C-alpha cells in the first residue's frame, strides 16, 4: 500500500510485522510540529481506551478461550499470508471459521474445507464478507428481520441484495451462510455449500432454502442441483450468468437477485410461485437519450456489477461478460466496472468504505460526451461507509453541471442495497439521492431496466413453467452436531482481527471476545511454521519440561566462586571495542525495542562511553557497540 502511494520511506521499508507506521507526505516544512502532538494525543487516547477494553481482549488463543470458553466461531480479518495456519488452529479447536480474510491460496482453501467437513464444522470463506447466523449480522452485513428463510451464498453482495429485498418485502432471514466466492469452483467442489444446505434442511425454523452462486463450474453446479432435488424443503436458486427458461422439479431457478428474493418470500408465505415476476416501469418524464449515448456502471459490489453487466449485455446483445482490468462489461462504449476488483483496491480501501475511486470515475465519465447514464450502487450496513450518499452527492452534482454546460443530458441511476434498520437507513438514503436528482430503483435489476428505458430500450422476462426433473438424486447425509448447534443458538465468536466487527455481534445479542492478534515470531514465516509444527508435540514437550523443572526444584545451588567478568569472558578484554552482553537471541540496535535501547544508553553512560544521552545515541547509531548474547 505504501509503495503504491509513494509513501514507502526507508524507515517504513524496514518495519516488521508488529511495528506501527505513521507516514506523512506534506509540502509544509514545519508539518512535524503539528503532527507529533497529534500522534501523541492519538496514542494517549488509544492507551486510555485500552485500559477499559483490553481487560476483555485476548492476545493469544489460550486467553481467548479463557475469556469465552464456550466459543464456537472464529471470525478472521487478518492478513491472508498468515491466515491459513490460524484458521487451521481454530478448526482443530472445534471452532467454525468465518473468514473475511482473503488472499488465501486455493490449495489452502480446499485443505481447510476438507478438514472442517471431517470435523463436522463449517468453513465460511475465505474472502467471505457477509453472513447472518441466528439473525445476528456478521462482518459486512445488513440488518435484516428474522424469519423462516435460510440463505446459502457464494457471493457477498448477492446475499446482501437478496436478503435486503426479502426484508423490504416483509419477509425475514434466520441464517445467511456465506461460503466464499470460490466454493463452487471445480477445485473446491462446493464443500461448504453442500454442508450448509444439509444443515438448513435439518434446521426446523428454516422453511425455505435460497442458494446464491457466482458462475459455477458446470459439474459442481450439477452436484449441487442433485442435492437440492433430494431434500424436502422448497428451494430457490440463482446461478449468476444463467438465464433459466423454466423451473426444474423442486428447484425454482431465478434469473435476477430480485426474482430470487420474491420467489423466496412467496414460498415462505405458502403463496404459489408466479410464472413471471417482471414488472414494467414507467419512463421518467425526461428526454429520451439518443442512440449514441451509453451506460457506464460504477459498482462497489462485485455481484451487483456482474448482474448489471449481464442484463445490459443480454438486452443489447453485447456478447456477454468480460473480466479484465476491473471491467465486467466493456463493449460498444458500454462499460460496467467492479470497483472492488483488486486493480482498484490495491493500495486503497474497498469502495464500500472509501468513495474516492468512484468519485474519480464519475468525474472522468462526466467529461466523456458519449456518457448518457451513470449507473451505480450504494451498499449500506455494518462495515460500509457511514454516509456514502453524502460522500457521492457533491460529485454527482458537479458531473451534472459539467454535462449541462456542454449542452448534454446526464442521468444518474442508483440501487440502494439496505434496510431501514441499517445504521445509514435505507429510506433516508433513497430520499436524499432523489433530492439530489438521482433516479433510484427498488433493486439492481430494476436500476438496469430504468437506465435502458432512458434510452428508449424496453426489456422483459419470459414466463417460466415448472418442468419435471429427470436427473439423479442423492442420499442426503446427516448434518454434524456442531453445525446444528451453531444454527440453533446465538453464535459465540472469537473475533480475530478488526475490532469493529464486534459491534454488530454485540448489538444483536451475540457473545464475542476480541483477540488482538499479531503474527508470531515477528512475522517470520519459517519460524511460524516451526512453531506450528511444535504445537503437535505440545504434550510431549510439556512432559519433558516438567522433568527439567523438577530437577531444578530438587537441586541445591551453592556458590562456587566470584571472579571479574574479564577473566572468564575474553571478548571484554578488547579495550578498543565497546561491548555489551545481553539476554536472549542475537539482536542489532535497529531491531531493539524502546526499553531495551534505553537500557543500552544507560549502560553506555555508566561505562562513561558518552557524557549524555544524545552522544550515547550517536555511538549506537554509528555501530560502535558490539552486542553479544
Where do the PLM segments sit?
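Long, compositionally biased, glycine/small-hydrophobic-enriched stretches that function as flexible linkers
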Residues: 1-53, 82, 430-432, 463-476, ...
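Catalytic-core regions of core metabolic enzymes
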Residues: 1-475
Amino acid at each position: 500500500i505504501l509503495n503504491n502511494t509513494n509513501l514507502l520511506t526507508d524507515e517504513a521499508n524496514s518495519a516488521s510485522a508488529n511495528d506501527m507506521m505513521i507516514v506523512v507526505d506534506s509540502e509544509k516544512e514545519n508539518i512535524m510540529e503539528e503532527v507529533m502532538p497529534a500522534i501523541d494525543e492519538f496514542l494517549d487516547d488509544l492507551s486510555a481506551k485500552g485500559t477499559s477494553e483490553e481487560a476483555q481482549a485476548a492476545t493469544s488463543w489460550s486467553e481467548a478461550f479463557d475469556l469465552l470458553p464456550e466459543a464456537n466461531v472464529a471470525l478472521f480479518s487478518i492478513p491472508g499470508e498468515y491466515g491459513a495456519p490460524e484458521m487451521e488452529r481454530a478448526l482443530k479447536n472445534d471452532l467454525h471459521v468465518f473468514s473475511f480474510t482473503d488472499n488465501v491460496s486455493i490449495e489452502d482453501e480446499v485443505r481447510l474445507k476438507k478438514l472442517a467437513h471431517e470435523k463436522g464444522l463449517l468453513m465460511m470463506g475465505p474472502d467471505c464478507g457477509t453472513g447472518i447466523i441466528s439473525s445476528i449480522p456478521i462482518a459486512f452485513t445488513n440488518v435484516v428481520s428474522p424469519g423462516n428463510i435460510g440463505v446459502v451464498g457464494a457471493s457477498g453482495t448477492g446475499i446482501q441484495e437478496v436478503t435486503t429485498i426479502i426484508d423490504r418485502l416483509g419477509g425475514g432471514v434466520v441464517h445467511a451462510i456465506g461460503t466464499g466466492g470460490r466454493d463452487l469452483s471445480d477445485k473446491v467442489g462446493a464443500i461448504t455449500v453442500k454442508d450448509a444446505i444439509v444443515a438448513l434442511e435439518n434446521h426446523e425454523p428454516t422453511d425455505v432454502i435460497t442458494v446464491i452462486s457466482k458462475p459455477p463450474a458446470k459439474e459442481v453446479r450439477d452436484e449441487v442441483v442433485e442435492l437440492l432435488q433430494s431434500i424436502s424443503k422448497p428451494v430457490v436458486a440463482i446461478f449468476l450468468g444463467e438465464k433459466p427458461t423454466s423451473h426444474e422439479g423442486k428447484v425454482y431457478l431465478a434469473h435476477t437477485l430480485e426474482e430470487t428474493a420474491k420467489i423466496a418470500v412467496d414460498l415462505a408465505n405458502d403463496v404459489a410461485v408466479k410464472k413471471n415476476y417482471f414488472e414494467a416501469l414507467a419512463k421518467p418524464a425526461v428526454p429520451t437519450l439518443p442512440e449514441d449515448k451509453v451506460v457506464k456502471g460504477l459498482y462497489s459490489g462485485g455481484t451487483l456489477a456482474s448482474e448489471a453487466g449481464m442484463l445490459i449485455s443480454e438486452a443489447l446483445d453485447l456478447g456477454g461478460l468480460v473480466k479484465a482490468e476491473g471491467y465486467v462489461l466493456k463493449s460498444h462504449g458500454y462499460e460496467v466496472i467492479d470497483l472492488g476488483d483488486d486493480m482498484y483496491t490495491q493500495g486503497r480501501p474497498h469502495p464500500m468504505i472509501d468513495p474516492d475511486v468512484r468519485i474519480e470515475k464519475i468525474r472522468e465519465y462526466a467529461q466523456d460526451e458519449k456518457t448518457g447514464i451513470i449507473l451505480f450502487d450504494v451498499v449500506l450496513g455494518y462495515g460500509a461507509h457511514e454516509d456514502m450518499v453524502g460522500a457521492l452527492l457533491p460529485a454527482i452534482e458537479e458531473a451534472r453541471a459539467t454535462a449541462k454546460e456542454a449542452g448534454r443530458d446526464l442521468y444518474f441511476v442508483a440501487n440502494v442495497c439496505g434496510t431501514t434498520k441499517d445504521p445509514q437507513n435505507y429510506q433516508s438514503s433513497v430520499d436524499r439521492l432523489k433530492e439530489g436528482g438521482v433516479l433510484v430503483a427498488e433493486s439492481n435489476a430494476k436500476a438496469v431496466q430504468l437506465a435502458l428505458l432512458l434510452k428508449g430500450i424496453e426489456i422483459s422476462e419470459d414466463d417460466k413453467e415448472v418442468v419435471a426433473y429427470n436427473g439423479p438424486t442423492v442420499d442426503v447425509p446427516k448434518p454434524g452436531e456442531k453445525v446444528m448447534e451453531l444454527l440453533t443458538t446465538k453464535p459465540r465468536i472469537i473475533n480475530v482481527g478488526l475490532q469493529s466487527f464486534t459491534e454488530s455481534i454485540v448489538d444483536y445479542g451475540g457473545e464475542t471476545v476480541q483477540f488482538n492478534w499479531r503474527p508470531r515470531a515477528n512475522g517470520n514465516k519459517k519460524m511460524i511454521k516451526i512453531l506450528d509444527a511444535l504445537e503437535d508435540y505440545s504434550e510431549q514437550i510439556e512432559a519433558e519440561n516438567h522433568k527439567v523443572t523438577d530437577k531444578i526444584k530438587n537441586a541445591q545451588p551453592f556458590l562456587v566462586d566470584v571472579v571479574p567478568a574479564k577473566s572468564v569472558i575474553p571478548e571484554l578484554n578488547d579495550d578498543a571495542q565497546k561491548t555489551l552482553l545481553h539476554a536472549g537471541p542475537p539482536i542489532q540496535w535497529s531491531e531493539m525495542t524502546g526499553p531495551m535501547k534505553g537500557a543500552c544508553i544507560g549502560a553506555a553512560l555508566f561505562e562513561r562511553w558518552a557524557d549524555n544521552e544524545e552522544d550515547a545515541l550517536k555511538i549506537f547509531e554509528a555501530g560502535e557497540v558490539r552486542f553479544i548474547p
